[in-house]
Amino acid sequence: MIMKNLFITLIATFISVVTFAQKPDPNFHIYLCIGQSNMEAGARPAEQDKDFNDPRFSFIAAVDMPSMNRKMGEWYTAVPPICREGNNMGPVDFFGRKMIEVLPEHIKVGVINVSVAGAKIELWDKNDYKEYIDNERDWMKAIVEQYDGNPYQRLVEMARIAQKDGVIKGILMHQGESNSEDPLWPERVKKIYDNLCKDLKLNPKETPLLAGELKYEEQDGVCWRFNRDIMPRLPEVLPNAHIISALGCESTGDQFHFSTEGMRLLGYRYADKMLELQGFKEVEERTLTLDTKKLGIEISPTLAGIFFEDINQSVDGGISAQLIQNNSFQAYNVPFNTDSDEFSKVDTVFFGWTIINKEGTGKARTVNDRPLVKDLKPLYDFDPDDEYDDSKKYQQYSVRFDVEDPGQGFGIAANGFGISEYVRGWGNKGMYSNNTQIPSIPVEKDVTYDLGLYLTGDSYSGSFSVYLEDKDGQVNSNVITISNIGNDWKKYEGTLKAERSVDSRLCIVADAAGTFYLDFVTLVPEASQLWMEGKYGPFRKDLLQALADLNPTFMRFPGGCASEGTDYWGQVFWKNSIGPVEERIGFRNHWGYWTSQYIGFYEYLLMAESLGATPLPVFNNGVTCQFAGHKYVAPLDTQEDRDRFQSIFVDDVLDFIEFCNGGVNTEWGAKRAAMGHPEPFNLKYVGIGNENRGEAFWDRFDIIYKAVKATYPEIIIVSTSGAADAGREFDENMKKIDELYPDTIVDEHYYKGDDWFYTNGDRYAQGMKRGAQGNTYDRSKPTRVFVGEFANNRTNNAYASTLAEAAYWTSLERNSDMVVMAAYAPLFCKKGYNKWNSNLIWFDNRGMWRSTNYYYQKLFSVAGDRAFEMTPAMEGAVADSTVYMSPTIDTETGEIFIKFVNSECVNKTFTVNIGNKKVYNVSVEFISSFDTKVKNQGDQNYYSSHPDYNKVPSFGGPGAAERPGLREMAWRFAPKVKYTEAIVPHTKEYRKVKKSFDFIMPENSVGIIRLTPAK
């Protein structure tokens, strides 16, 4: 009896132990994972990922992995691969690692990953999977066969094993590329979700499904519309579904897959959401309350504008659509700069041109004894007795050819605006525009190009062939033949149609011996390629469209320092830039390269008009750039000096005002009309000087100021506070303005770093001290501020600079009763020509990259006409100091605009209390990036004409020349430049709202909320 009772006790104990062993551990959280190739995992581990071996994160092998001694149905520490052999890392890996990093140490995480590359969602449909897979590709069938032909069933089987050890807490999914145009995808997902809940006895209310977005368009994703059009319906169909953003997740470079860092960020976002749902991560909640009845200041209607300066090769080779560099051969003519690396030093080297000699003999050189324009009249009365030989400004150069034997052709080729290597400064090599020998004219297939050139001869009897040619000497267009050129200059015109989209050069080749001259060669794309089809001048279409998208209200031009010049020869005189292009006087500009003035002041006025922007020209006042050594100051010592100053510098401003606003019966108004614009340009502003200081400047400023006020009292003059935001120069200039020129708009410039922009948001607030003299920005006085140049220039347009600048911009708008204008600087930079490392728009010969600074300027370019009262972003009873905002309202339409910056890497859920009973349509447009080091323009050496991207790809092997298509294939796989931008705006539309609405302010974001009254 005793033995029997002991046996029963032992049996009961055994049963109890077994029962206890089989009881699931509530602290072992299990997640089911399905999807396509990104979920399957193809990212190579980074160095930081390789030593992971924490048993708190494990997985059940859903297939055998014999090479790793892993058996299906058993648990292993989650050392990749965790899906199948041959995989790497994916979002599931990073999800689990982030989870155990945040969760209490007693909680473990397990995953089951049954994903199949390329598969439609139908593969996980327990009823219809077989019909789907039977019609799929063999390689996919082979993957599915590892799951015994039924991935859904394998997932359920593995989940049941897992349920013996832990508790299923959710489902992770990344699928959709193969269903990217399937409007029923949300319903298909719900069906699978419902089946899993039923088969595994899961409570849907306690089992969230997290679905990750696909690659965005800016990451070259081809399925981005799925994120916009289909995926948002999933939470509507499946209430416990949550969308995980892929915004900013880095790409591998193909159309579908994320890189390791992209996978990491996506996996962390899955984890953040799951932790939030489980209460392990605090939801960042904020409130915002509007009171549109309490109106504030009037918002300056001219606050957002642009500053266009000829810097970084912005004009020739930039906004100018004329494709021939040094088209008039004047770039040889650079007085006082013959030692410059950037210009030809001898008359047989042609800046940007290459001699063509096909087995012939001859010579070519620049000469100035055969001027294209006879009796070119100087428009300024320069002193003939001073140290400068002003006749050099007006010398005209052409190329003389003396052909002894043409061989197969003797002539010259224009290479366009390319680059070549040169040594800058202290032995530093750079890529610049010196004597470009690389064919760099960016022609497009089937586009026609309007050709113009001038020829004359000394009884020359031969003909010329004009055509496009690629770097391999292959003709890339039709051939224009010119004959019987005569002994007088004559313009020849024609059209060339490109056969291939390859960088080319323009060849002008003679076929006979003799002497002839060539001058003023132009090549301009057909009207369809020009801004507004050329109606407003020969401007490059894409670059001007980018400016138009900024909605600029004013345009300052042509500088900056470029308006002053570094020395006597670099001064800008507008009269030399108008009239027939053949008569315009080029010069070496402040930034060290040749300015042809093919785009002159008249074209700048047209440009501003086409953009809907008020022109704001800046004039040289006889003091060259003081930062560049103060090399020239126009003399005022004698009456003759003063008269000459009047005729050159004072009259230059007065005559330009007449050119812009005068009637057609005035001298300069008539010239405007003759150029095709009888209507006035309605000039309102004139800038005198730039970042100037000291007595020499203010004496000359005073003369011009008084002359303009006496003749055109309606014109508003822009003065200057100098080159810094504070300091002795700033204080002295502001004192001078306070005392003598209070009716001017003072132009302030500053280039700073993140901290300055974040901490100076109250710079223009009422009552704040201005400089060291104790004065304030007093609204009761007429002086107003133009922030004519500003930028966060410490990080080369990294996204961090955008967050800081945008935060500062909200303060400019909040104080736009004082700050009436503001403009980022510089506006443009051509890659390979950068004189400045932070620029709003980067471009090359074929495309552009808009910086994230550009995009916040675009988002913030719209506003209402009045500010109104709004609470700060409140976190409970405390204002969030990392959120910067500016609210305005259009008092006529009732539309509300709220600009915002979230400078913290945290998503914040806002409840916005509108404060009235109206119904609104709400949209939020924003940019955001987890990584604040991202630069939209990428590497400085990443552009189309750079040698690394402009090589002839190698191909060869036996019979290579006879193999058609081999060359084309080599080009196809050669390195190419892409014009994608990592960070671009996205829009979230809301249904009609009333009284209040919720929205998520993304991490590190800049955006604008628009509330439009519903009709």
State where each predicted segment sits:
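Extracellular and organelle-lumenal recognition/adhesion modules and their flexible linkers in secreted
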Residues: 283-596, 614, 631-644, 695, ...
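C-terminal beta-sandwich/jelly-roll accessory domains of carbohydrate-active enzymes
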Residues: 903-1015
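Solvent-exposed strand-to-loop "edge" motifs in beta-rich extracellular domains
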Residues: 454-459, 497-499, 862, 901-903, ...
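The substrate-binding groove and active-site-proximal loops of carbohydrate-active enzymes
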Residues: 80-89, 140-148, 176-183, 257, ...
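Conserved SGNH/GDSL esterase-like catalytic core that processes O-acyl groups on lipids
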Residues: 66-162, 180, 218-220, 399
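An active-site-proximal structural segment forming one wall of the substrate-binding cleft
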Residues: 148-166, 496-499, 503-507, 532-552, ...
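Aromatic/acidic polysaccharide-binding cleft in carbohydrate-active enzymes
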Residues: 248, 257, 302, 310-311, ...
